[in-house]
Amino acid sequence: MEIAKEKSGAKPEFIDNEDESLRESIVIFDFGSQYSLLIARRIREMHVYCELVSHDTPWEKIAHLNPRGFILSGGPSSVYEAGAPLAPAYIFESKLPVLGICYGMQAITHQLGGVVEHSEKREYGHALLHSSVANSDLLSDMPEPSPVWMSHGDRIEKMPAGFTALAYTENCPVAVMGNEADIYGLQFHPEVVHSPNGKIILKNFVFNICKCHANWTMGNYIQESIHNIREQVGDGQVICALSGGVDSAVVASLIHKAIGDQLTCIYVNNGLLRREEADRTLHVFKNHMGMKIIYVDAVDRFLDSLSGVTDPEQKRKVIGSEFIKVFEDEACKLGKIDFLAQGTLYPDVIESVSSVSKASAKIKSHHNVGGLPAHMKLKLIEPLRYLFKDEVRLLGKELGLPDEMIWRQPFPGPGLAIRIIGEVTREKLEILRAADWIVMSEIKKAKMYHQVWQSFAILTDVKSVGVMGDFRTYGYLVAIRAVTSEDAMTADWAKLPYDLLSVISNRIVNEVKEVNRVVYDISSKPPSTIEWE
């Protein structure tokens, strides 16, 4: 589908476009739900491209995506609140399929002339979904009944003209609705794991109703990215920050594949790395990547900048700013450098901005997107900014990166600075490195390294009294953090065996003399974040 050329201010005119050489997409409008990004993940898992955009995004901003359908996310608002977000009118004018989820369903109802009312019986948690009709394209192959996850206080009192109730729950007579124009609404969340058959509904919408093809692969993404990188860079020169993690490794490999020796990689030792991190990283890159690499020892520079800084947000800003200064300095030494490459991922972008929906609060600045000073002289190139972590790993595999690089656990850009609560000092860094080395060694020995998303130690600013032999001690408290996750947007604490935790704790208090107490963090995300700072 294309938008016809039009005079300024005229209504958009939609034209069917069956050219399959154009990449198809599903466009998801974000109304502020904590699950919005999860919808995008579910669509991507089907090998169909999608993007999450603000609910008020104009057509001109998404026309290039060649949308085959629209999804309206859930959200915390009520359609009758002053300033409540609504769907753009063009989605209904486009004649393309629309699926509203929770608040998205209520927005459809309200905008198309139905009635939404506050429900006396709110539904939060599990419910059983029962079909109201014999056949439905949206509910095809759904078990009867099917458990779903409800989270709403408003309900549909009267459907818009032409709509039919397709399914119900005990407290929700219109749990699913639809019309002949392929506009549908769900009063539950099919994207969450608590709706075990929700993927069936999403697949029905994407393939049977929107007629998408499962042709978005990492191989295609590589070719498209190479083309885009060459177009963006031209004859320019690029420097890429190597961190040792999979994100920067994939970025470097992808850009090198596109422009070869126009890329120079810079590995900065900022003094915030784990034990043996620098040596291991340089070894892997020199032996497997075959790129130009510059090693920069900036330990004193970073630690001096962090002196006296205790606020976690300020730490991130200081580190991000100092990184840019280092790269600018190195760029001057190299001559004319035009671009800085970064491994920014989709969740980084979503979590760092106030929201694509303007309805969610900023959680924390990401080191790749929040710490950049306004005066930065280098232009950014971020070829992974629309990918999830698991997609980056698949991309790395497609690019031929070694498994030891692809399957490394994520390590934050600010490094150990945000795993030390309070001021970062050389003494605290050595304590944390020793404790973290023990955690990682024992996790690997127990063959659980690839079963958890991240595992690490945190050096708190708490000290407590202990006894070692016949002597009183007053040492630091170290926390152990291990989580399971798919994409870092949500995470659950890992149920590590007690015996393993016991070994880790005993080793830390015996081998790291400044520590006399170890605790295990059993918080999930949300409400906690994975990192403590």
From Swiss-Prot:
Keywords, in A-Z order: ATP-binding, Glutamine amidotransferase, GMP biosynthesis, Ligase, Nucleotide-binding, Purine biosynthesis
Gene3D superfamilies membership: 3.30.300.10, 3.40.50.880, HUPs (3.40.50.620)
Pathway, per record: Purine metabolism; GMP biosynthesis; GMP from XMP (L-Gln route): step 1/1
Enzyme type, top EC level: ligase
Binding site for ATP: S243, G244, G245, V246, D247, S248, A249
Domain Glutamine amidotransferase type-1 as annotated: residue spans: 25-215
Active site: C102 (nucleophile), H189, E191
E.C. number(s) listed in UniProt: 6.3.5.2
Catalytic activity, reaction form: XMP + L-glutamine + ATP + H2O = GMP + L-glutamate + AMP + diphosphate + 2 H(+)
GO cellular component entries: cytosol
GO molecular function terms noted in the UniProt entry: ATP binding; GMP synthase activity
Domain GMPS ATP-PPase stretches: 216-408
Assembly notes: Homodimer.
Function per UniProt: Catalyzes the synthesis of GMP from XMP.
Protein name as annotated: GMP synthase [glutamine-hydrolyzing]
